[in-house]
Amino acid sequence: MEVYNDDTEMRSPETQPIKETALEVYNDTAEIRSPETQPIEETALEVYNDTEMVSPETQPIKRRKKKSMVWEHFTIEAVEPNCRRAFCKGCNQSFAYSNGNKVAGTSHLKRHIFKGTCPALIHTHDNDNNPLMSTPYTPKTDTPRRRYRSQNNASPYVAFNQDKCRQEIAKMIIMHDYPLHMVQHPGFVSFVQSIQPHFDAVSFNNVQGDCVATYLAEKQNVMKSLEGIPGRFCLTLDFWTSKLTLGYVFITAHYIDSDWKIQKKLLNVLMESYPEADEALSLAVANCVSEWGLEGKLFNVTFNHPASNSAVENIRPQLCIKNPGILDGQLVIGNCVARTFGSLAKDVLEKGKDVIKNIRDSVKHVKTSESHEERFTELKEQLQVPSEKVLSLDDQTQWNTTYMMLVAASELKEVFSCLDTADPDYKKPPSAEDWRHVEALCTFLKPLFEAVSTLQSTGNPSAVTFFHEVWKTQSDLSRAIAGEDPFVTGIAKTMQEKVDKYWRDCSLVLAMAVVMDPRFKMKLVEFSFSKIFGEDAGKNIKTVDDGIHELFTEYMALPSPQNTTSEGGKADGLSDFDTYIMETTGQNLKSELDQYLDETLLPRVQEFDVLDWWKQNKLKYPTLSKMARDILSIPVSAAAFDYVFDMEPREMDEYKTSLRPETVEALICAREWLLESNASSSAAAQNASATIKSEA
């Protein structure tokens, strides 16, 4: 006997002898029953197709109930004598079923349903509500064989879903910053139609609505994640310009989560029609606070670019009126450290612009001609110059590229000095004076470059990171001003004015962050201020000490489970015990802050995690740890890490300025959130994989 796949015929057992044992082969299950467990007549071999049972004898056929799920969608009708066909209940299309003794299988019927070719099923069923779609379809092999099919290795068919496809297109456009009009591009339409002819093309308005819907859904997730944040929020304001004189304010929240990890989240991108107005930024902050429910939760605001005094003063009331406990709005940083150091670098480059042009022209001569570069390389090898630096032209909108060009050229100055002998086209090598000035420029730019590079390497650097950088820069400038080189002195004086202003505006914030680091506390403040202010150091140290104690007093006054009183006015019934301690020890009980400041400094280990230390000591310092959490969340930079070396404010592209302000905000914010979500998922998957490997 031969048993064929569903698409083949079944031959009568009369043409082939059959053993006395009974064998039943069931389609789709391949169940073999033992003769001991079920007595069967000698010639009783029954082969069950998905449709019926065929007996080897001429006796009346005993029909068996059809088991295949396809019969929920098909009916059998006789079209001619000894010829029956299967008709689809949805589209009424007919398929071969039986012709005489030949019985077709059900594979072609399954394909009609599973492959989604039935017009009646295309738009009315999906994988979740159609039970048939959840049954996987396995293509047949060319070689006839008994079917012992495994359901685990089959790939389930997913029905076409127009709404799901539109959601994915919206996410694609958002994540990859594609233009909304791409859905109407002929190439895109043709591509999609070739993949899924049933997909209905979407218009610009449709995809714009889909993108906004995606943004709103993601916004709900962000809002939910922010509800459980135990501390306060710090806001950074990044201002973008446009060719249409419109301004765009990017507002990002910085905070420390319940696991004591510093986080940030883009909240708003607000268009300002009159960005030069002093109240523009304060209105943007007010809208953000109201929209995200941050009343009473603000701690600090940091500006990306220098703000006018009036603009800063307009922000302060929003911090102190509805946000008690933040020193009457003193914790406002009018200019972030990235822009401050960028402005200093710009001053350096401006002072040396003539020298830099000579160096740039020399580098351009080498890099814009293969023959010139070959001669330069050959000369370098002949002179045995050990430098591994590679020459490159600078991007004048990124000051770090100019610095790296100067460093590379300075190390290769010996080659440039002799290049005119090997390359007759090279006419104007820099002079010895030029090279001396280049070295001076690099001396000023190097500490700025290293400090700003920290913003890229650490992701969310705290104020502790830059306290040392700022006061060290100020000390270096003071020494440079006292020098005798007029070129160096002139640069140092120009830089000194900006550093002094930044220090006046931000020294309190930076110093308070240092105090919250158990490796430094007030000791580093005292040491650095003595270097910077000299005789006036004591007054400035007292300002920081008074500020940190005043802030702690305000935190002690805030309602919390630790210090709430009962109806009788008593905290915990141990006031008499406190009196006893004061009488027996002869001194008042120390506050958490004073106890913390009096303890010995921790060793300065390189991998120290200050947030983790406070997490471990929050029970010892219940109130002080809350204050430390908020102080250490203050960002010193409002610039995105990709743009910390920009010389000018970012500019919104013309395409986005042509869109509605709400659409611009939806596209930019949703992109940020989706990318963060994908990055978190990838990191979690990698951690899980690493854990499995380590356990194995």
Curated annotation (Swiss-Prot):
One of its GO terms (biological process) is post-embryonic development. Signal peptide: none annotated. InterPro entries: hAT-like_transposase_RNase-H (IPR025525), HATC_C_dom (IPR008906), RNaseH-like_sf (IPR012337), Znf_BED (IPR003656), ZnF_BED_domain_contain (IPR052035), Znf_C2H2_sf (IPR036236). Disulfide bonds: none annotated. Disruption phenotype: Very slow growth and absence of expansion of cotyledons or development of normal leaves or floral organs. Short root with an excess of abnormal root hairs. Extremely rare production of some photosynthetic tissue. Changing C118A: Loss of DNA-binding capacity. A zinc finger (BED-type) spans 65-132. PROSITE patterns: ZF_BED. The keyword Oxidoreductase does not apply. Zn(2+) binds at C88, C91, H112, H125. Keywords: DNA-binding, Metal-binding, Nucleus, Transcription, Transcription regulation, Zinc, Zinc-finger. Residues 129-141 have a biased composition (Polar residues). It is found in: Nucleus. Changing H73A: Loss of DNA-binding capacity. One of its GO terms (molecular function) is zinc ion binding. Residues 592-674 are annotated as: HATC (Hobo-Ac-Tam3) domain. GO terms for cellular component: cytosol; nucleus. Residues 129-148 are annotated as: Disordered. Changing C88A: Loss of DNA-binding capacity. The keyword Ubl conjugation does not apply. Homodimer. Transposase-like protein that is essential for plant growth and development. Binds the promoter region of the DNA helicase KU70 and genes involved in chromatin remodeling. May regulate global gene expression by recruiting other cellular factors. This is Zinc finger BED domain-containing protein DAYSLEEPER. The lineage of its organism: Eukaryota, Viridiplantae, Streptophyta, Embryophyta, Tracheophyta. The gene is HAT.
